[in-house]
């Protein structure tokens, strides 16, 4: 019928995460994966998975202060989200519009002017980005964030 069908990135990762053709997933998917990992490793009694979607980077610093990094959504290389979207139909027939340049990083620190990330994209490693730019890119991708909290 010429229509493209695909999975819901709130539930699963569309595509291959090891290939540039993969898309990405959102916080609820990562929450499930982290919970499964904690259960498998016998660590669910020690940690709680927390979906902190809706919080700014500044608000997430409380976790960094407690020694806990945050899985953080922004954009590839902290560039603007393009206007164009990739579209596909979900199983229920809903049109899903993917915001391009979605990227997941690990927020690991901050100082007066920057947030610090472990960034797997092109082996960037630990990198600093200006706070205002980070907040803009985080908001553009939906303010998704996931972390662990010690019980």
Where are these regions (language model features)?
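Cysteine-nucleophile protease catalytic domains, especially the papain-like/related folds used
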Residues: 1-68, 125-126, 149-151
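Noncatalytic regulatory segments and standalone regulatory/sensor domains
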Residues: 80, 84-99, 104, 108-151
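Short secondary-structure junctions and interdomain/linker hinges
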Residues: 41, 70-71, 141, 145
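Structural recognition of the beta-strand scaffold that forms the well-ordered cores
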Residues: 48-49, 69-74, 106, 116-118
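Short regulatory "switch" loops immediately downstream of catalytic or recognition motifs
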Residues: 36-40, 75-88
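Catalytic-core segments of thiol-dependent peptidases
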Residues: 38, 60-64, 68-76, 92-99
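Generic detector of bulky aromatic hydrophobic side chains
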Residues: 8-16, 26, 76, 83, ...
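Generic intrinsically disordered, low-complexity segments enriched for polar/acidic and small residues
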Residues: 2, 7-10, 20-23, 44, ...
């Amino acid at each position: 019928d010429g229509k493209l069908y695909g999975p819901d990135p709130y539930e699963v990762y569309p595509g291959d995460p090891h290939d540039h053709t993969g898309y990405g997933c959102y916080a609820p998917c990562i929450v499930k994966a982290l919970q499964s990992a904690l259960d498998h490793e016998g660590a669910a009694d020690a940690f709680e998975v927390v979906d902190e979607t809706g919080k700014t980077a500044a608000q997430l610093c409380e976790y960094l202060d407690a020694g806990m990094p945050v899985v953080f959504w922004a954009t590839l290389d902290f560039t603007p989200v393009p206007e164009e979207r990739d579209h596909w139909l979900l199983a229920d027939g809903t049109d899903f519009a993917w915001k391009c340049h979605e990227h997941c990083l690990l927020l690991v620190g901050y100082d007066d002017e920057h947030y610090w990330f472990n960034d797997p994209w092109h082996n960037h490693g630990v990198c600093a980005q200006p706070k205002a730019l980070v907040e803009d890119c985080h908001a553009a991708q939906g303010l998704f964030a996931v972390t662990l909290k010690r019980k």
